[in-house]
């Protein structure tokens, strides 16, 4: 799970934060846990920050630590709650690409809860649009863009998706 806030332990180093689920839920030896945590940090390009503490790294780096921690146990499913919350557009794109690459690389099913249309366009294969707790629409990006559904909520979502796709991922 990748939380909206990175949800890191301030008193633990970056390496220790990634090791935390391994310490709690794996039967690995201490050396194996370190090796796995370092591998995950390397995968998100943060191996050089392993001895730093969360307060010493940027918000984008904290999100990448959260991603490394989320994949440490090699899950089949990855749940992301607003993974780009509080990040600038450039860093958001990096996080989107990282989630997409890791999901593809490890063949994980990923569920992303987001309001970020760039994320929807960039990494969404299948989209479920929920409005006021009700499923309004489900399908691929192209199905949504070419949909003839006409409720106000469906039109609003469709127009936002079309506008964002024309604007591009700047």
Spans of features found by a protein language model:
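Helix N-cap at the start of a conserved alpha-helix in ABC-type nucleotide-binding domains
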Residues: 89-91
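Short helical segment in ABC ATPase nucleotide-binding domains corresponding to the A-loop/adjacent helical element
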Residues: 15-23, 34
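Conserved ABC ATPase signature
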Residues: 53-57, 61
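Catalytic Walker B motif of ABC-type/P-loop ATPase nucleotide-binding domains
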Residues: 78-81
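A short, proline-enriched helix->beta-strand linker immediately N-terminal to the Walker B motif
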Residues: 72-76
């Amino acid at each position: 799970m990748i939380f909206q806030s990175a949800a890191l332990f301030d008193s633990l180093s970056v390496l220790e934060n990634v090791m935390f689920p391994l310490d709690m839920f794996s039967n690995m030896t201490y050396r194996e846990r370190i090796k796995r945590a370092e591998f995950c940090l390397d995968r998100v390009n943060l191996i050089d920050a392993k001895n730093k503490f969360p307060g010493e790294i940027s918000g984008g780096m904290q999100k990448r630590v959260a991603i490394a921690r989320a994949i440490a146990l090699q899950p089949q499913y990855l749940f992301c709650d607003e993974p780009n919350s509080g990040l600038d557009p450039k860093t958001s794109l990096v996080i989107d690409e990282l989630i997409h690459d890791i999901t593809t690389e490890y063949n994980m099913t990923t569920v992303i809860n987001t309001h970020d249309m760039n994320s929807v366009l960039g990494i969404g294969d299948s989209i479920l649009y929920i409005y006021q707790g009700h499923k309004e629409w489900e399908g691929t990006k192209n199905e949504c863009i070419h949909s003839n559904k006409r409720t106000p909520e469906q039109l609003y979502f469709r127009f936002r998706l079309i506008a964002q796709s024309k604007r591009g991922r700047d």
